[in-house]
Amino acid sequence: MKGTPQYHFIGIGGIGMSALAHILLDRGYEVSGSDLYESYTIESLKAKGARCFSGHDSSHVPHDAVVVYSSSIAPDNVEYLTAIQRSSRLLHRAELLSQLMEGYESILVSGSHGKTGTSSLIRAIFQEAQKDPSYAIGGLAANCLNGYSGSSKIFVAEADESDGSLKHYTPRAVVITNIDNEHLNNYAGNLDNLVQVIQDFSRKVTDLNKVFYNGDCPILKGNVQGISYGYSPECQLHIVSYNQKAWQSHFSFTFLGQEYQDIELNLPGQHNAANAAAACGVALTFGIDINIIRKALKKFSGVHRRLERKNISESFLFLEDYAHHPVEVAHTLRSVRDAVGLRRVIAIFQPHRFSRLEECLQTFPKAFQEADEVILTDVYSAGESPRESIILSDLAEQIRKSSYVHCCYVPHGDIVDYLRNYIRIHDVCVSLGAGNIYTIGEALKDFNPKKLSIGLVCGGKSCEHDISLLSAQHVSKYISPEFYDVSYFIINRQGLWRTGKDFPHLIEETQGDSPLSSEIASALAKVDCLFPVLHGPFGEDGTIQGFFEILGKPYAGPSLSLAATAMDKLLTKRIASAVGVPVVPYQPLNLCFWKRNPELCIQNLIETFSFPMIVKTAHLGSSIGIFLVRDKEELQEKISEAFLYDTDVFVEESRLGSREIEVSCIGHSSSWYCMAGPNERCGASGFIDYQEKYGFDGIDCAKISFDLQLSQESLDCVRELAERVYRAMQGKGSARIDFFLDEEGNYWLSEVNPIPGMTAASPFLQAFVHAGWTQEQIVDHFIIDALHKFDKQQTIEQAFTKEQDLVKR
């Protein structure tokens, strides 16, 4: 190479070609090249002194240059033909990379998926260790280029398996991320041929301790010798735990008899954690300290076009990702879902090449299961001719059925306008593809969706009317005016509604209209999402939720079924008992039997329980219709009074002296949910009535504590019991789950509150604040959850309607 005056790249803007051009420029060589399009990569090469031409022409090729081409360059390319006619020296990209690595300790990463991520992580670790490696990587990092010639003898590079060029390399260490049924057209359509090439490649490494392969990949397992890494217990580098917190991953692994705990990676997704584990193994093998590795992974800045944020607005999120194979798409969407919870995920997918789409036509439909909406657009052909077997509208229908999502086809030229009308507050859009789909994110960089119209509903007919107003007043402070326009709907004690924008003025009014009146109905119709902050009957028991479902409106808080079930304390006890959660022993009573046999009821209770006992109504709030009784006369009196409020009553064994422990929940028990707390509610005398709970009639409010002074085992126990109850009740929306903790350390379920108090003094919101949330984030989540519940139901209803239409035809 020393005597070569110049290198000319056909397609110099390509991510792989530009990396090698950068290395040559760093080493002092003269570089020129041509490409069809201007790009950031070309600008960065020009800044280093490269001469770059737009388009391909024979005049661009210097007479004395080595001409570099890649497998994507067509045989009839004018510059390629010119080089042949002139008998210029021609080098395939892989041959040049091999020459550039001569004399270096090369660490090569190959495999169907994850090459760029893994090689970028290895590069970042060696840079953090001050090793100054050379590298040629198929992606741009936020803080460095894709190619660089360093001062050390370490060289990190991707080794592309797609075109059979692995034969050119003699690596010192390798990572093989996985093998898939991809690019088999270069292997006579035979997977065995690809496996053989991978085997030959790995065998070039003389030290098997420097051959790392994915032990979770069934094709690699048994076909490669070296160090297996992955989640399977038999892997030599075993990832023993993984969890994702927002956009970061945390994992622990064992390797060579050592355990490395809680590695923090600034990337989401199990697949990225596996890539990072492989990078850790390589770095440890090369003698890099684990603390340096930790630091590098924690601050890793990611790779261009790998879940790269494209927009500015905080009201929604637009991400761009290079994923274009079904495995990559599924992994990417899974990591996004785990990061954003119940926010609506809109996947915008541009298939890459007709040949790849045809090969993967059976697997693509199931790749979008973690999305909520899929927009399918035109195939990026990369010069290929269309295939008759591919009909995008049919593929959209297959995606809908196989991924259980709404899917539609939108022409590429119409997508930006479509999204401007479709994106709403809190949406997460992910463009997927290796073609020119990146232009969509660029076009929406400064876009802001319109505000959501929120209807805050409060008051109500129950005796907890005043608490509802206090809760709504507190919640309204944290409804962001940047995201939402708020209207208030106040229900008076007679069930009449009034609406407006001025909450204090509405509270002072006393009149109202039927919810079916033209004024109220019109106001409800304009609302995007309803937010009920109602307590007790006609608001917390499924009644108002059913009304909202009839209106066809999203609503925050508990679903109809959770609200109705939780407000039936007897049904709640039966459900909890069925899943092994201890409940306070009780005896149910109904009004009909009580009226005919009160003496028998009293006798049964006295024989079952000892005094004091607790009398409770079955369908009222958590502190209404609840009485502590200490003798037979008081028992009869309070049962009679309780039946004035409810047709179902029960008597519980007293838990006086026990501690009242509460766990707060929001989200969907079947997918994403969060549990906060526990907290303790402490009364002055042990029994907390309605007045003490809220501080009425001059009584001091019951104290709320988050410092429970309990063992970790006890805290884990109550959270597990609360989780069991929430799942058994198919929790959707919100709930506070209350327990008694007796002197022996046993927990007993007391009740479940579907819309807990949300006043400034209430523990429900405080619990999430203690967990690190802001009040605004809690309110946002209520609205996100409401939209999620509604969207899922709409998708099901649309599918049902579609199937009905097909049957009719």
Curated annotation (Swiss-Prot):
Residues 573-784 form the ATP-grasp domain. This is Bifunctional enzyme MurC/Ddl. Pathway: Cell wall biogenesis; peptidoglycan biosynthesis. It comes from Chlamydia pneumoniae. Its main location: cytoplasm. HAMAP family: Dala_Dala_lig, MurC. Pfam families: Dala_Dala_lig_C (PF07478), Dala_Dala_lig_N (PF01820), Mur_ligase (PF01225), Mur_ligase_C (PF02875), Mur_ligase_M (PF08245). The gene is murC/ddl. Binds 2 magnesium or manganese ions per subunit. ATP binds at residues 111-117, 606-661. Cell wall formation. Residues 1-450 are annotated as: UDP-N-acetylmuramate--alanine ligase. It comes from the Bacteria. It catalyses: UDP-N-acetyl-alpha-D-muramate + L-alanine + ATP = UDP-N-acetyl-alpha-D-muramoyl-L-alanine + ADP + phosphate + H(+); 2 D-alanine + ATP = D-alanyl-D-alanine + ADP + phosphate + H(+). Mg(2+) 1 binds at D738, E751. Its cofactor is Mg(2+); Mn(2+).
